[in-house]
Amino acid sequence: MDKTYNPQDIEQSLYQGWEEKGYFKPSGQGVPYSIMIPPPNVTGSLHMGHAFQDTIMDTLTRFKRMQGNNTLWQVGTDHAGIATQMLVERKLHAEEGKTRHDLGREDFINKIWEWKKESGGTITKQLRRLGASVDWDRERFTMDDGLSEAVKEVFVRLHKENLIYRGKRLVNWDPKLHTAISDLEVENKDKQGHMWNLRYPLADGVKTQDGKDYIVVATTRPETMLGDSGVAVNPDDERYIDLIGKEILLPIVNRRIKIVADEHADKDKGTGCVKITPAHDFNDNEVGKRHKMPMINIFDKDAAILTQGETYSFDGKELEFDAPIPERLHGLDRFAARKAIVAEFEELGLLEKIEDHGLTVPYGDRSGVVIEPLLTDQWYVRVAPLAEPAKEAVKNGDIQFVPKQYENMYFSWMNDVQDWCISRQLWWGHRIPAWYDSEGNVFVGRDEAEVRRENNIADSVTLSQDEDVLDTWFSSALWTFSTQGWPANTDDLKTFHPSDVLVTGFDIIFFWVARMIMMTLHFIKDENGKPQVPFKTVYVTGLIRDDNGDKMSKSKGNVLDPLDMIDGIELEELVQKRTGNMMQPKLAAKIEKDTRKVFAGGIEAHGTDALRFTLAAMASTGRDINWDMNRLEGYRNFCNKLWNASRYVLMNTEEQDCGFATDAQKELSLADRWILGQFESTVKSYTEHLDNYRFDLAANTLYEFTWHQFCDWYLELTKPVLFKGNEAQQRGTRNTLITVLESLLRLMHPMMPYITETIWQRVAPLAGLETENTSIMVQAFPVYNAASVDAKAMDDLEWVKQFILAIRNIRGEMDISPSKPLSVLLANASSDDVRRIEENNSFLASLAKIEEFTMLENKDDAPACAASYVGNLEIMIPMAGLIDVEAELSRINKQLEKAEKGLAQVQNKLANEKFVNNAPEAVLAKENAKLAEFSDAKTKLLEQKAKIESL
């Protein structure tokens, strides 16, 4: 094996070999186990969230594969409607100076397919870099032929069951992209704005209790007053009780609107009077329905003012009454209209006052423009009938959330479901399978031929297909079963559905998880006709944040690319990556400064295994993770530790008799028996942690055993045997070295696939295992074997460790060289202590550098000593000639002074109220850690000083 571990030399060639040899495919043997990857956007590239979730999924997949399950990790990508269309539109404009309208729908869609063929595979290439053991031969795309058929089938069936309908309702409208968007694509931003207090004149000479002929409404959106249908007051608000049912003469448009009583108006907020605009506000829309108010749309698709308000009944039917808009406002952008309307109110003497006001403004996450609630004709799914079985599936335990607390989030959404708007005004996506005749009649079917056949429509009648496409989440909701061949009842569907676990983020529990549950329960039944769930467990991950706890985003310039941590990146390239193509270039200077400070030397290459192990080790259930480059560095060192330990094993076993192929006698040392027992305990804990989705505890278990038990202790304890033992003892230790390392590599493999495969290929033949044309990933996962745990050996070796540590502590405290042989005096020795010393003399002599043991009948006979204890056994080392007391006290005093100075500085900082109130949490945590460190150092140094002074 090479002297140093270099992941770049092994990773990519290994992966290619695994894929070519078909190791990722289901074996066809054993209990089925399946995971469906959340399909990443085809436009996307790997980010830390992907790396985190993919590490968890691959760990589970490899774990179950090695346990003998018939394992499928289903891979695929999402067509990502808006994201893909925008990307190709930008490319088209940059390269050819054209818009999609210049090309026309068909040619533009062909352009997107061309782009997908050329560039759409970026994320799948990156998935390979992570070591993802997905079955690439089964890769799906949400717009491939099979999935497109499934989407049409679901739409047609739901429509026949009256669960899909077309209606005029309020949606999040993006005036730049000209499409409805989902709540998830809306980014709410806190902004400083204004609250305009407007006077609305009362009609018919009506007066308020205090004699005014108007009431005052407060609004942050004066422009929408053109579409007002009423004013609401609280039914318990005595100021306005006499006005309920009376009318207002709406300024500028001179339209009469009613005053209604509704709980939506808060009598303690503002003036207590709320203008109601059902066509341009979601809350107002609900009030409007309750009072059967008309809906008056005042905006076109660009959010500019119409020439005439479009009027509809509260349930979306066209109305015949006029809602005129003054010509001077026609065609004005909504924000220009706002200024014009406020100016008119001021001119009319109807502007009461303007107040500064903080408000939350919805922006399109891709277009960056303010989203407008707009009345449009859209297709909807009736969610309520689908939601009840979906709630029951979680209540009765058919689906479990890990951590369980996310069930509450799920239920809070499911108890307040609204009908789902599934149409989008885009060209890229699943086109809605509905056709219209010239009179506007709508027909739904799988294709035009079916529509004509089922509705007896002659070929001479012109039909035109709906221009809209389906929400991307609609096809994603069918992911677990459409990927397995539905609507056909395929063997894959019977074998791998329901899937075992879904790994996802909390932010899409409603948008994706709940919809998958609803759709799957509705369409998929088992052999007994019982509705099937899409997955048995939902494992919910937190977000990965930067080291200060801030969300990673391009605008903050704190995004970390997983591949940069795997391969490394130079500082200049990193700066360019973080500051190039920014939406807000003015932030670039600060981002560059911060990047140069934090990553002065760029980012070193750490390899895939170190990244995966870090992600697993930080995966405490459901909590957000503050990324820590130091931990990544630490786990890169862990890979080195494993590599070097394996080299030690190979150097001491290759071309030696390791006792696997012969009947020659093997004698296991106490250390051999101990490490075998320790390994079994590790197998037990690690397996339990993975079964319970505690990847953090599983990683920690591996780390503790590998670094502290196997490397720090066992390898050291083998040296006396390998250098001085007889043949049987050496054979026993070599056999144990190989047995434990080979088994440990199999245990580690699910989390760290590359390094374990590389070492296993060298180690396994020494254990008599065949490695030609096979891989560690298809070997058996270690199973806990209680018979291999020798309790007496475990106790005895732990005692030996404590004894050695006691000697090392004395050396450390007294600054005695580790290589200096010592004489040891022992008092209060039990018969077990005596036995253990006699049986393990070679270990103690070698690892603690002890040349002589003396048992004392009376410890008062001992000269001046430094002492320590193992249980009741007192271990004493005579100090005469070992240390210079004065020099040692001088050294300790210097260290003490340094610790006290550091302690005082931190205490002063934490006593500063301004610092504590303004510092980020991560900074405070670091200061508190320093406080504990300096306090601890001071305590230990004072103890040390007292000991030396007592000599």
Swiss-Prot record:
A motif ('KMSKS' region) lies at residues 551-555. CDD domains: Anticodon_Ia_Val (cd07962), ValRS_core (cd00817). Residues 879-950 form a coiled coil. Signal peptide: none annotated. SUPFAM superfamilies: Anticodon-binding domain of a subclass of class I aminoacyl-tRNA synthetases, Nucleotidylyl transferase, tRNA-binding arm, ValRS/IleRS/LeuRS editing domain. GO terms for biological process: valyl-tRNA aminoacylation. A motif ('HIGH' region) lies at residues 40-50. It is an enzyme of class 6 (ligase). Its EC number is 6.1.1.9. It is found in: Cytoplasm. ATP binds at K554. Catalyzes the attachment of valine to tRNA(Val). As ValRS can inadvertently accommodate and process structurally similar amino acids such as threonine, to avoid such errors, it has a 'posttransfer' editing activity that hydrolyzes mischarged Thr-tRNA(Val) in a tRNA-dependent manner. ValRS has two distinct active sites: one for aminoacylation and one for editing. The misactivated threonine is translocated from the active site to the editing site. The C-terminal coiled-coil domain is crucial for aminoacylation activity. NCBIfam families: PRK05729.1, valS. This is Valine--tRNA ligase. It comes from Pseudoalteromonas translucida (strain TAC 125).
